[in-house]
């Protein structure tokens, strides 16, 4: 039973809840674009951008690992919404979701093969199959798993420290991003295709921590839906306020690794281990801080809902825009395209990120004026269901006028 809001203020409607999730999803994609474009440009330059570059450090501190983690949280939310709707329409929602993931895996494989090895779709698809075991679990069970995974994530650096003490001559595994992207920076497009999967094997070999973090955030998204935090959000203002306070404190604690970096304390082994613990959990705390901050703005400053709507179009077409940003970025920056990475610094990379996001925002706005789904979203839906339920044309469901007050 949904609790009704008493007193002043209007409850957040179903339409507004949909908009809120689209806002967060669109904002997360902006962060992903910025981080990925810095990664591509860095790879071409051999990761030699000045370490004291302020903008580069800001992106590293406040964006890297945060937005892809936020996207993972939203994937878990989307899983629950999909399964709840599918359960009302088909006898086996598990099979339908498995089919949906298989199609997403196909998109990821094509993305890796023809565009960029830094793909997350394939990892989402593979990790997503694990979610099927949690759909019918209680919120309490899911929470226990989340706590266990977080505790293990905090303890991992301790185990690493002990291993390093025992194996002082331990070898250092090559950094995935440096190896894969730098190896492609000087290749032609056809050469890049032929060697990309070799690099993918290297990435898969060291992907446990990535899948682990993704799955943790998937479960957190599942938990939020099971607890109905996105239903009647107005009535749950106190809950969202507590979530924001806890997330803010946790984020500030993990971001204290910045101080260790600024004062070069991380060169000491003890401080280095502490910095590792903080850094490995920065994605979790950062993503929850950003998401809960948007919730606070959405709930406590309703006059800002209109301006926040600029993110919704990209959020509704997140799959299409994600694939387009990779295509545009690799063509712009890598040497088989325009090779602009050789000629720009951090400020230029940041401006290109914003410019591409603006292009994607404009494209999404124009497209959704005529159609209900983005092009890749429509294909995904068609392949999942075998047909498109309802008209693919734009409908009043996603009208923005109702919340721009």
From Swiss-Prot:
Keywords: Cell membrane, Membrane, Transmembrane, Transmembrane helix, Transport. It is found in: Cell membrane. Pfam families: DUF418, HGSNAT_cat. The chain crosses the membrane at residues 20-40, 62-82, 103-123, 146-166, 205-225, 243-263, 282-302, 321-341, 348-368. GO terms for cellular component: plasma membrane. It is a multi-pass membrane protein. PANTHER family: HYPOTHETICAL MEMBRANE SPANNING PROTEIN, INNER MEMBRANE PROTEIN. Involved in transport. This is Uncharacterized protein YrkO. It comes from Bacillus subtilis (strain 168). The gene is yrkO.
């Amino acid at each position: 039973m949904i609790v009704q809001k008493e007193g002043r203020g209007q409850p957040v409607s179903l339409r507004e809840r949909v908009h809120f999730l689209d806002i967060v999803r669109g904002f997360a994609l902006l962060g992903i674009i910025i981080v990925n474009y810095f990664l591509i440009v860095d790879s071409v330059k051999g990761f030699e951008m000045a370490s004291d570059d302020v903008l580069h450090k800001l992106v590293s501190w406040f964006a890297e690992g945060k937005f892809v983690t936020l996207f993972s949280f939203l994937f878990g939310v989307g899983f629950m919404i999909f399964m709840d709707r599918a359960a009302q329409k088909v006898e086996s929602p598990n099979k339908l979701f498995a089919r949906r993931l298989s199609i997403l895996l196909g998109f990821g494989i094509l993305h890796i093969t023809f565009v960029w090895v830094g793909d997350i779709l394939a990892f989402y698809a593979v990790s997503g199959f694990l979610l099927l075991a949690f759909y019918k679990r209680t919120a309490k069970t899911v929470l226990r798993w989340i706590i266990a995974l977080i505790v293990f994530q905090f303890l991992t650096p301790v185990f690493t420290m002990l291993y390093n003490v025992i194996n002082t001559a331990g070898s250092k595994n090559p950094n995935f991003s440096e190896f894969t992207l730098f190896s492609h920076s000087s290749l032609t497009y056809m050469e890049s295709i032929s060697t990309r999967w070799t690099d993918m094997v290297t990435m898969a070999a060291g992907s446990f921590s990535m899948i682990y973090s993704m799955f943790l955030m998937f479960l957190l998204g599942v938990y939020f839906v099971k607890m109905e935090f996105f239903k009647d959000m107005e009535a749950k203002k106190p809950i969202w306020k507590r979530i924001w306070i806890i997330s803010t404190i946790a984020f500030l604690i993990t971001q204290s690794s910045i101080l260790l970096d600024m004062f070069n304390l991380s060169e000491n082994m003890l401080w280095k281990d502490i910095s590792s613990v903080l850094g490995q959990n920065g994605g979790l705390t950062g993503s929850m801080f950003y998401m809960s901050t948007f919730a606070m703005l959405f709930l406590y400053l309703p006059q800002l809902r209109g301006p926040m709507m600029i993110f919704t179009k990209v959020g509704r077409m997140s799959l299409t825009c994600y694939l387009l940003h990779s295509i545009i970025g690799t063509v712009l920056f890598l040497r088989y395209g325009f090779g602009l990475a050789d000629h720009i610094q951090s400020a230029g990379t940041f401006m290109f990120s914003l410019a591409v996001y603006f292009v994607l925002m404009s494209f999404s706005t124009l497209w959704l004026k005529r159609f209900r789904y983005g092009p890749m979203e429509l294909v995904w839906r068609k392949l999942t269901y075998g047909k498109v339920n309802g008209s693919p044309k734009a409908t009043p469901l996603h009208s923005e006028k109702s919340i721009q007050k």
